[in-house]
């Protein structure tokens, strides 16, 4: 991290002080640059090309050194379009890696890979910047205690709990509620943990990025009236941008998150949507740099690139970065090298189900498909573990009986199975929950449910104490007391 002087005078005053090279070759987003002997820039240094194209338009392209080729040549990858660049143009070595603004000034704003604001809300305070390439925290700095990161979302906390400083994979197709779940997590971390969030849009559609921004403004996650009170910083490297930008935008978002963890000592949520596009961009860059492709055409450095990003996402003694990563699975093939490499780093998976979304059960988290390494008695305690297992067993039995119910009806089941089905349907509905960020759409106030309350609620359903209550009393409520109150209201309405 660097604290820059308030008056940003010219970084280099005379031509002698500059390290200037010239473009020798341009192949798409890849440039070869020749520097004077003995003045070669380091790997990952940022190079800046400034000048005018043949029509007289101003050009300002930032590149990152990827290879030293020998004969005073370096190969660099551009972070923006290379249209208008010509051979012989001057290239200035900044003598440092790409650096981006960090700290409170980033909240409520949208940035590109270079840390430049792209939301037309004016400049950002760049007195505090940080290089995007950093080492992962040393072993001695890590917080080795396994603790649960309480989200306030019942289905997540009970059945697939997140680890504080862990990495979670979010699987789901279009329209099943990924964005709303992400926004609720951003809202809850700010409310319950006093934390902030950073959203890294890696290869997202421009429309999706815009929709997310608008929805965050509507739900209050981004405060338009007082931008400093916002709870999230957004960093976008969209689909239409060169592979260099898409490959590095994840690191830009991570660098902003690291500052909140290390300097502000906060709990941070880092969203990466989509981690597959990070791998895909790396694959494109690898081919452009002339490396021999590996399995299925991916880059030979796939594990290294993934590791260098994932190892920086962790808990230290100061604070934590808990990362939620949307994972696209190409052709639904889980053995594809991209998702397979991602799985090795994940502590939990949250799978969103289209079937549940169709039933109107939100969040549409699949209780049987979602997993977590944290769901062990020695970590969460016997009570939590037992309750979660019994909930899963009840739902699994209901799933097995559904074919029989569809053909023969409920009446053909044994008394015991009918009771299981009734409880499973109550559990299924009780796993739904009204969200704070959806208040503006649904009209029902959001609910944050603590872990102890969640466990108590499901224990009461499993024990049979609430068998007499109607199913709809459990739908879209917070804790179990609200369900019993709702049942009494429904009873009163009938009379």
Swiss-Prot record:
Name one cellular component (GO) term. proton-transporting ATP synthase complex
Q: Which domain of life is it from?
A: Eukaryota
Record's catalysed reaction(s) = ATP + H2O + 4 H(+)(in) = ADP + phosphate + 5 H(+)(out)
Q: Enumerate the residues binding ATP.
A: 172-179
Give the GO molecular function terms: ATP binding; ATP hydrolysis activity; proton-transporting ATP synthase activity, rotational mechanism
BP GO terms, sorted: proton motive force-driven mitochondrial ATP synthesis
Check the UniProt entry and state the signal peptide residues, or none: none
Query: Per UniProt, which keywords does this protein have?
Result: ATP synthesis, ATP-binding, CF(1), Chloroplast, Hydrogen ion transport, Ion transport, Membrane, Nucleotide-binding, Plastid, Thylakoid, Translocase, Transport
**Main localization, broad class:** plastid
What membrane topology does this protein have?
Peripheral membrane protein
Q: Cellular location of this protein?
A: Plastid, Chloroplast thylakoid membrane
Report the EC number(s), separated by commas if there are several: 7.1.2.2
Q: Name one Pfam family in it.
A: ATP-synt_ab_N
Similarity annotation: Belongs to the ATPase alpha/beta chains family.
Q: What does this protein do?
A: Produces ATP from ADP in the presence of a proton gradient across the membrane. The catalytic sites are hosted primarily by the beta subunits.
The record describes its quaternary structure and partners as: F-type ATPases have 2 components, CF(1) - the catalytic core - and CF(0) - the membrane proton channel. CF(1) has five subunits: alpha(3), beta(3), gamma(1), delta(1), epsilon(1). CF(0) has four main subunits: a(1), b(1), b'(1) and c(9-12).
Q: Show the NCBIfam families listed in the entry.
A: atpD (TIGR01039)
Protein name according to UniProt: ATP synthase subunit beta, chloroplastic
């Amino acid at each position: 991290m660097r604290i820059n002087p308030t008056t940003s005078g010219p970084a280099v005053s005379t031509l002698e002080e500059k390290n200037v090279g010239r473009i020798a070759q341009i192949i798409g987003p890849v440039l070869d640059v020749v520097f004077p002997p003995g003045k070669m820039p380091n790997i990952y240094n940022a190079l800046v090309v400034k000048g005018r194209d043949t029509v007289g338009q101003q050009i300002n392209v930032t590149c990152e050194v990827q290879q030293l080729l020998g004969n005073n040549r370096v190969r660099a990858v551009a972070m923006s379009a290379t249209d208008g660049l010509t051979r012989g143009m001057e290239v200035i070595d900044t003598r440092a890696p790409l650096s981006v603004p960090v700290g409170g000034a980033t909240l409520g704003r949208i940035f590109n890979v270079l840390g430049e604001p792209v939301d037309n809300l004016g400049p950002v305070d760049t007195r505090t910047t940080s290089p995007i390439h950093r080492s992962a925290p040393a072993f001695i700095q890590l917080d080795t205690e396994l603790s649960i990161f309480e989200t306030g979302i019942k289905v997540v906390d009970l059945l697939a709990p997140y680890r504080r400083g862990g990495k979670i994979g979010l699987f789901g197709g279009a329209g099943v509620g990924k964005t709303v779940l992400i926004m609720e997590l951003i809202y809850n971390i700010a409310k319950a943990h006093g934390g902030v969030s950073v959203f890294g849009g890696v290869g997202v559609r421009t429309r999706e990025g815009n929709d997310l921004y608008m929805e965050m403004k509507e739900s209050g996650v981004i405060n338009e009236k007082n931008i400093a009170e916002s709870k999230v910083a957004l960093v976008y490297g969209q689909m239409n941008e060169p592979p260099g930008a898409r490959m590095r935008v994840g690191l830009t978002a991570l660098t902003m998150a690291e500052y909140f963890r290390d300097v502000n000592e906060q709990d941070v949520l880092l969203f990466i949507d989509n981690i597959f596009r990070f791998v895909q961009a790396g694959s494109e860059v690898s081919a452009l740099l002339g490396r021999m492709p590996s399995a299925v055409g991916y880059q030979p450095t796939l594990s290294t690139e993934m590791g260098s990003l994932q190892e920086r996402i962790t808990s230290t003694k100061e604070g934590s970065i808990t990362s939620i990563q949307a994972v696209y699975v190409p052709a639904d093939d889980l053995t594809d090298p991209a998702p397979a490499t991602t799985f090795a780093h994940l502590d939990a998976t949250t799978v969103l189900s289209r079937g549940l979304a169709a039933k109107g059960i939100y969040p549409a988290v699949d209780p049987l498909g979602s997993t977590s390494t944290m769901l062990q008695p020695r970590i969460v305690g016997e009570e939590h573990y037992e309750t979660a297992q019994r909930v899963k067993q009840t739902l699994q039995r209901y799933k097995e009986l559904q074919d029989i119910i569809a053909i023969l009806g409920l009446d053909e089941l044994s008394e015991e199975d009918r009771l299981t089905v009734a409880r499973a349907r109550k559990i299924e509905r009780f796993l739904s929950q009204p969200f704070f960020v959806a208040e503006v759409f649904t009209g029902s106030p959001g609910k944050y449910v603590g872990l102890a309350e969640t466990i108590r609620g499901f224990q009461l359903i499993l024990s049979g104490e609430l068998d007499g209550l109607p199913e709809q009393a459990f739908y879209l409520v917070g804790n179990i007391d609200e369900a019993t109150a709702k049942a009494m209201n429904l009873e009163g309405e009938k009379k």
